[in-house]
Amino acid sequence: MERFFQEYLVKESGASAHTIRSYRDTFVHLIDYIEAQMHVSPEKISLSMMTKSTMTAFLDWLESDRSSSIRTRNQRCAALKSFFRYMIYEDPTHMSQWKEISSIKSKKGPNGRLDYLTIDGVKLLLEQVDTNSIRGRRDLTMLMLLYNSGARVGELTSLTVSSVRADKPYVVTLIGKGSKRRIVPIDEDVMNLVVAYLHENNLDNPSKGAYPLFSNIWGEPLTSSGVAYVINKYAAQARILHPELIPSKISPHIFRHSRAMHLLQAGVNLVYIRDILGHVSVKTTEIYARADSGLKRDALEAAYVDMGIHEPEQKSWEKNQKLREYLKSLA
């Protein structure tokens, strides 16, 4: 297990800190499950217990006992499969056992609604930030950059001062899944906020390029949960004013969804949106086009052809008073 995390995930796969934490949590939950449901203490757990039936039961337990969503279940499943595919090479004598576990399929669920904020919703949330305090100015800069860049929360928290180019063309370099780098253009207004933030926090010095761009009170990089806390704080305030604009549940990822939807609604090509978001395939980006009913309606209206068939001014049944009264009585 130690080699899997330190050698394979970190050195060979180049997994992000977010991925490593997610995998770590998966195995912590697995140990909890074995201890609670199989009555085996952690020090007595052996590889012989790692069977397909045990893993499937564990995934079911996540849903039933921990109230995990299907998406979370599938993330845990992916972590397990990654580890046991690794074990095929590390322990080939039990190859069939590891292959069985690796064959577990992700669970299909109902097509969930893609939550995103309208432009008014984003504005309302940002308006709740108190820019009279240094913490508030940090929060506004962070949230504006999160939205404008379409970054994942893990990409945001891993930013350093040197990730930002404050000269034209304004860009931020994000490190995404698999340590893949992508350069995303940033609006001038947002970059002005970033530059002011750097100056106020004495970060506009070349010697501080490796410092975290957004940190907590101890100078450590802000965590994903820290960003989520900030967002939920302002979302709660905004929800009181206009509950119809702010979903009951909100996470940092909603800024990414919102940015993609707003670009799409503005007529930006899906291929360009794909590059901003760092998707491997444009098929992944197409979820935004499928989610926007307004765009579907506009497309149908644009494709409408008048076939010359029109509704008569007076319906045939309206000519017959008795028939009309009869039909109305059915209601």
Walk through the language-model features, giving the residues of each:
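Conserved catalytic core of the tyrosine transesterase superfamily
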Residues: M1-A331
